[in-house]
Amino acid sequence: VSRGLGDVYKRQATEIAKIAHEMPEYAHAVVLADDSGLEIDYLNKEPGIYSARYMGEDTSYDIKNQALLDRLDGVPDEKRTARFVCAIAAAMPDGCCEVVRGTMEGIIGHKIAGENGFGYDPIFFLPECGCTSSELSPEKKNELSHRGEGLKKIRKILEQR
């Protein structure tokens, strides 16, 4: 299932990059686009590709986060595994499109914690760090995050072109 969702992230990022690249002002530029989401294994990869629209686009992340915590109430840590997934597409001036995928593995914590993040960061717990993604410094989060991993991969590809 995760592989299929990963392919959807890649397809959506690629489509966005290609559409933007067709605009005259970007025709001779490298255009980057991304699609990302939170996959919770116990919830069959929800909210997944619908992460931004989960429970409705106008629903605050405070409410979304609490709803996910409520759904996982009583679920042991070993079954709370989750990951942030990011696909980054680079549409090139020659029409070629490169796509990479980055992930950050963790678990869904038991409470909302931290002030440095956004979205689902306050419930995404990193056991190796002993804190949520929202409790990391911005520098540490960039080093560990799914987007950071994806950007490192796409940068390497761009430097080789």
Each predicted region: which residue ranges?
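Catalytic beta-strand/loop module used to bind and position nucleotide/cofactor moieties
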Residues: G95-P122
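A glycine-rich beta-turn/hairpin centered on an aromatic-Pro dipeptide
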Residues: K79, R83-M92, G102
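Phosphate-binding chemistry for phosphorylated carbohydrates and sugar-nucleotides
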Residues: K10-E25, N44-K45
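C-terminal alpha-helix
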Residues: K153-R161
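Hydrophobic alpha-helical packing residues
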Residues: A17-A20, L68, I154
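Single conserved hydrophobic/aromatic residue that forms the stacking wall/gate
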Residues: V1-Y9
